[in-house]
Amino acid sequence: YLAMVGAPIASVTGLEAIYWNPAGVDLSLASANALFSHRTYLADMSMNYAAVSGKVGDLGSIGLSFRSLNIGDINVTTMDQPDGTGQIISPGYFVLGLTYSKQLTDKVSIGANFNLINETIDKVASSGFSFDFGVSYKNLFDVEGLALGVVVKNLGGTMKFSGNGLFVQANDQSSQRGPTYLAIDGAS
C-alpha cells in the first residue's frame, strides 16, 4: 500500500467518512450504520462522537452526526486572586452535522456535510454554520486500488462570540461615576 498524509480522504468508506470525506458515506456495503465513541483525555477532557447513516434507495445516503468536546472544570484565577476565585468554568463545544452522499458511477462519489457549531466558555458563547464538500475517485487511471480524494472543509462565516464575559469592570478611584463596563474587542 502506498499512502500519503491525509490518505483517509481518498480511501475511507462508510460512516467514518463523515469526518474525513463525506463522499465515502454512500460507499458503505451496509444499508444502515451506527457509531459511538467516547474518549477521555488528560485533565478531565473528553470527546464524544455519535453518528448514524442509511441508504435512501437510488438517492444516495444520508447521515447525522454529533461530536462534542468537554474541556473539564477549570478554576478561575485573576491577577488579584492567583490561587482561585472559587468560581469554576467548564468550556466546551459541539458540532451537529447532516450529511448527504451519492455514488455517481462505479468510480466517482460526492458528498457534503452541513454543520451547526456551538462553542461556550464561561459567560461567552458563539454559534455558526459550516459546510464540507468532498469528491472521491476510485481506481484512478484504471489502476486497481489507486484512489483520489478531494475535500474542502469548514467553509462558513466567522464565529463571533457574545455574552457578559466580554465586558470587564473598570473602577476609576478618582471618578464619582461608579464602575464602568468596557467591551473587550479582541475577543470577537
Each predicted region: which residue ranges?
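N-terminal periplasmic accessory domains that precede
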Residues: 16-27
